[in-house]
């Protein structure tokens, strides 16, 4: 979005601009304090959002779709989780999740560098060993930093890693080169990756292609192939 000067506030180290008017000899800290107070006053005047009812654990039939995947994941999240969403499909879908109390949501939209989540998840689980870490990543992003899964297995960490296997760089296809080969990636046998990265892998892996198959990894039910 393009904002005109009249629609914006600019804060510099020793001056501030409100609309077209500049105010000098104002320290940045003081200007930020004033702006924060104004923002709080404005937010207090806004109506609170209506809390939606919790989703049920009803399992949908048929092929796994974006809608069914994110609806199921919504019921899986619990208070205190740490959720990391990689760039692309994962971040776009996760942005609509309703987060319970004490959940940390880590996403990196500014630079848009794919592949950060696996390494960041290793750090998050190291810093918070008693919290559940959930990773949402695409297959293309995961291939860039998959070696950090070996670090997780070495340290006996147990994050939940959900790889959205789109067989390539889906966001790049949408931006440029929808049918170009450079947006294709090598197809991996993802359920065997933990065993390749650790001699003593204590990992449970599932391949999910239908919505009902999410019952095993998410709800502890049955119906999908465990590897």
Give the residues covered by each predicted segment.
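Conserved thiamine diphosphate
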Residues: 1-10, 41, 45-46, 130-219
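Glycine-rich, anion-gripping cofactor-binding loops and their flanking helix/strand elements
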Residues: 1-9, 100-131, 143-147, 177-179, ...
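Glycine-rich, acidic loop regions that bind phosphate or pyrophosphate groups
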Residues: 1-50, 176, 213, 218
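General beta-strand structural signal in soluble alpha/beta enzymes
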Residues: 10-11, 83-87, 106-107, 135, ...
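Short gly/pro/ser/thr-enriched loop/turn and capping motifs at secondary-structure boundaries
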Residues: 15-19, 91-92, 112-114, 142-143, ...
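Short beta-alpha connecting loops at secondary-structure transitions
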Residues: 16-21, 104-107, 144, 171-183, ...
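Active-site diphosphate/adenylate-binding microenvironment
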Residues: 49-130
């Amino acid at each position: 979005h393009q904002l005109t000067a009249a629609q914006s506030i600019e804060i510099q180290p020793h001056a501030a601009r409100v609309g077209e008017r500049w105010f000098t000899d104002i320290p940045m800290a003081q200007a930020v304090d004033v702006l924060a107070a104004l923002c709080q006053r404005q937010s207090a005047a806004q109506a609170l959002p209506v809390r939606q009812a919790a989703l049920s654990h009803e399992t949908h039939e048929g092929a796994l779709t974006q809608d069914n995947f994110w609806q199921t994941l919504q019921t899986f999240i619990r208070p205190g989780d740490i959720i990391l969403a990689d760039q692309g499909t994962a971040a776009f879908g996760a942005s609509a999740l309703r987060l319970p109390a004490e959940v940390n949501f880590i996403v990196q939209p500014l630079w848009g560098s794919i592949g950060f989540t696996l390494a960041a998840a290793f750090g998050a689980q190291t810093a918070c060993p008693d919290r559940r870490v959930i990773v949402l990543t695409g297959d293309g992003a995961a291939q860039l930093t998959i070696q950090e899964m070996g670090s997780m297995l070495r340290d006996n960490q147990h994050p939940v890693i959900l790889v959205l296997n789109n067989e390539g760089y889906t966001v790049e296809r949408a931006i440029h080169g929808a049918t170009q080969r450079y947006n294709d990636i090598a197809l991996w046998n993802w359920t065997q990756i933990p065993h390749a990265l650790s001699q003593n892998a204590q990992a449970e892996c599932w391949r999910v292609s239908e919505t009902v198959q999410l019952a095993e990894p998410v709800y502890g039910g049955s119906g999908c192939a465990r590897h």
